[in-house]
């Protein structure tokens, strides 16, 4: 007769826990599943050192994830894995996506992965989650992106302190906004694109003004409110502050646009602080699942993911990379550009959208119809997820939409969805 002592019992207890976690493992299959977007939620976008600056990216991520799961109408333990984009990770502690996931109240057995594809991080998270769902590795996942540019630290090289003092580098610039191959700011790449495609300062200013106008109209009409989850800021003894609206689009003076100096090229430059995106804080999350899981859970999806693609060009040409990803999408889906009702091309700079509209020869009236990053803000790890989620909310049944976003290093990602 076997005797079960304390050590044996401990081993059995550990084994039982291990077995309990195995339901979140991966199993592949031969046929691909259809993947749907069950919900999409995002925080408001805060200005740099603005309304959301007291919260780290991981907390913003938790808020977005929790809201997305609640709006999907499913129990949290149905989520079997989480991917979250996050670019400027320095100083946040280990595994930002894990922090965001547990902070959202999801099960401790939920695996997580943090994705860094610079500005395309949030969108790439959606693409990777969709792949996992298509292949049957998981049935329900959360994907999104988060960034708090207000909380990004400075750094200095390790080693002996040199004579004459130390040099601090801004991680926002070093890891987020610098072309490492040409050793200059991404804005210089934007200037290069403007010169190559003959896009003027006036065109960029006009586009930026239109972005602000469209964002205001979208907010005034209540169109954006459906995707927002409010953020409560504790004031330690004073009444809490509740942030429930994007901050950036209201901070504009159109009379100053033409008077601003160019930032990256003094002579014959075109890019200014007004026609480029800003530094911001925010997070977005989507619940993705197989069509089978949606049926089992009685979920009515917002949209289905039809196709997705990446592209890469010379690093200096990163602004035009979406124009190389989009044709892959259309070819894979068997669609023409005329079939696309809505385009979301991330406004890292006004010239990015103008360049891609020109290269793809698409109708500008269908592009960024509710504004974009120039006016709403660009928390770089969040933006790719934000534009996919926005499309999922505002497209009409049966319409197709394409979201595309460029990223530093010469890359781009793009996603094609159909509204259900």
Swiss-Prot record:
It catalyses: 2 acetyl-CoA = acetoacetyl-CoA + CoA; propanoyl-CoA + acetyl-CoA = 2-methyl-3-oxobutanoyl-CoA + CoA. This is Acetyl-CoA acetyltransferase, mitochondrial. GO terms for molecular function: acetyl-CoA C-acetyltransferase activity; metal ion binding. Pfam families: Thiolase_C, Thiolase_N. Belongs to the thiolase-like superfamily. Thiolase family. It is found in: Mitochondrion. NCBIfam families: AcCoA-C-Actrans.
């Amino acid at each position: 007769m076997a005797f079960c002592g304390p050590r044996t019992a401990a081993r059995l207890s550990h084994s039982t826990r291990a077995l309990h976690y195995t339901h979140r493992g991966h199993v592949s299959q031969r046929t691909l599943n259809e993947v749907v977007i069950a919900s999409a939620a995002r925080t408001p976008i805060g200005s740099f050192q603005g309304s959301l600056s007291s919260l780290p990216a991981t907390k913003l991520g938790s808020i977005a994830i929790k809201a997305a799961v609640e709006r999907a109408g499913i129990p949290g333990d149905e989520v079997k894995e989480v991917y979250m984009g996050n670019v400027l990770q320095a100083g946040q502690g280990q595994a930002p996506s894990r922090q965001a996931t547990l902070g959202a109240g999801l099960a401790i057995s939920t695996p997580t992965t943090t994705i860094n594809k610079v500005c395309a991080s949030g969108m790439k998270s959606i693409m990777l989650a969709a792949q996992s769902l298509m292949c049957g590795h998981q049935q329900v996942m959360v994907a999104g992106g988060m960034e708090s540019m207000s909380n990004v630290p400075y750094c200095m090289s390790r080693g002996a302190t040199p004579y004459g003092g130390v040099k601090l580098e801004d991680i926002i610039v070093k890891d987020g906004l610098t072309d490492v191959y040409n050793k200059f700011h991404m804005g210089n790449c934007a200037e290069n694109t403007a010169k190559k495609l003959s896009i003027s300062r006036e065109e960029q200013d006009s586009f930026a003004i239109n972005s602000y106008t469209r964002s205001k109209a979208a907010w005034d009409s209540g169109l954006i409110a459906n995707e927002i989850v409010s953020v409560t800021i504790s004031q330690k003894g004073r009444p809490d502050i509740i942030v429930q609206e994007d901050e950036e689009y209201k901070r504009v003076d159109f009379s100053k646009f033409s008077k601003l100096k160019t930032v990256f090229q003094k002579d014959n430059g075109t890019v200014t602080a007004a026609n480029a995106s800003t530094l911001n804080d925010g997070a977005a999350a989507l619940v993705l699942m197989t069509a089978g899981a949606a049926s089992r859970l009685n979920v009515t999806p917002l949209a289905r993911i039809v196709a997705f693609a990446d592209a890469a060009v010379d690093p200096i040409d990163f602004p035009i990379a979406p124009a190389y990803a989009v044709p892959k999408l259309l070819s894979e889906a068997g669609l023409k550009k005329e079939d696309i009702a809505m385009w979301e091309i991330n406004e890292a700079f006004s010239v990015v959208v103008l360049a891609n509209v020109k290269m793809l020869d698409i109708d500008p009236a269908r592009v960024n119809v509710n504004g974009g990053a120039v006016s709403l803000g660009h928390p770089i790890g969040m933006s790719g997820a934000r534009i996919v989620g926005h499309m999922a909310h505002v497209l009409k049944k049966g319409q197709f939409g394409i979201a595309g976003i460029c990223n530093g290093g010469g890359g781009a990602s793009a996603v094609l969805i159909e509204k259900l």
